């Protein structure tokens, strides 16, 4: 009986740990600005994501697609975030790092060129206009 309880406790702890460290199902971007945003990835941070976020909208990209865009399934992925990407003169907010294993995005806040990116949870950001 004691062995059975220990087995159940270990299984419950294992499931709880997996749930705590699980990656998000989607990468979500809430764009609360008047302009389209996009992430650029790749070795030179010059490959535009095929999933820009339109002005005043929320864009969700399945986590598996994020991994494909980043070119790997684990580790970290750097992305250069730009605004006004549907114009001839896009502006850069800056570079963020996405942990593909946990969904953690760093830095937690980034402000440049009149825009701010704020991380609001694993795999989730909000972009505002200053």
Describe each region flagged by the PLM:
Residues 1-9:
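Bacterial N-terminal signal peptides that target proteins for export
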Residues 17-19:
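N-terminal signal peptide c-region/cleavage motif recognized by signal peptidases
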């Amino acid at each position: 009986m004691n062995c059975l309880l220990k087995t159940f406790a270990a299984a419950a702890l294992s499931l709880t740990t997996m749930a705590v460290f699980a990656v998000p199902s989607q990468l979500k971007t809430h764009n609360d600005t008047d302009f389209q945003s996009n992430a650029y990835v790749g070795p030179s941070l010059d490959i535009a994501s095929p999933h820009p976020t339109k002005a005043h909208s929320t864009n969700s990209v399945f986590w598996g697609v994020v991994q494909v865009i980043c070119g790997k399934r684990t580790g970290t992925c750097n992305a250069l975030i730009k605004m006004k990407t549907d114009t001839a003169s896009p502006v850069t907010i800056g570079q963020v790092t996405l942990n593909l294993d946990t969904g953690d995005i760093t830095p937690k806040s980034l402000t440049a060129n009149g825009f701010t990116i704020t991380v609001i949870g694993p795999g989730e950001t909000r972009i505002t206009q200053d």
